[in-house]
Amino acid sequence: MSIRTGDSVQGFSLPARPGEMVDLAECIGTEKVVLLFFPLSFSPVCTDEFCAIRDDWSAYADLGAKVFGISIDSPFVTAKFAEELGLPFPLLSDMNRDVCRMFDVLHEDLFGMRDVAKRSVFVIDEGGSV
């Protein structure tokens, strides 16, 4: 079952880099949270997308929301991608695809690759609802 508008979201943990877990239960239900699902680190479209977000960061900061990018890449890759782009928010690794499945954002086939995250955005309010 996938998450839809109005549904409550439970917290979950994902690695931001090897050995560093981010527990979204600490902010879901108490703060606004923006989840940016993206297919692949270092791909041209994802690079352009995250550079645009970085360059217009004040629009996100003005929302008072915590922002997290999520992909199926390893935490080594997401950490390097975030570092190279100078992102002001963490990119999280969902290698096991549990969170992508929960939000129903997996491509069955993307250029011959199975179970890659769909480019999707979810905004979760302070009460924990999408």
PLM features: residue spans?
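Chalcogenol-based redox active-site neighborhoods
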Residues: 1-130
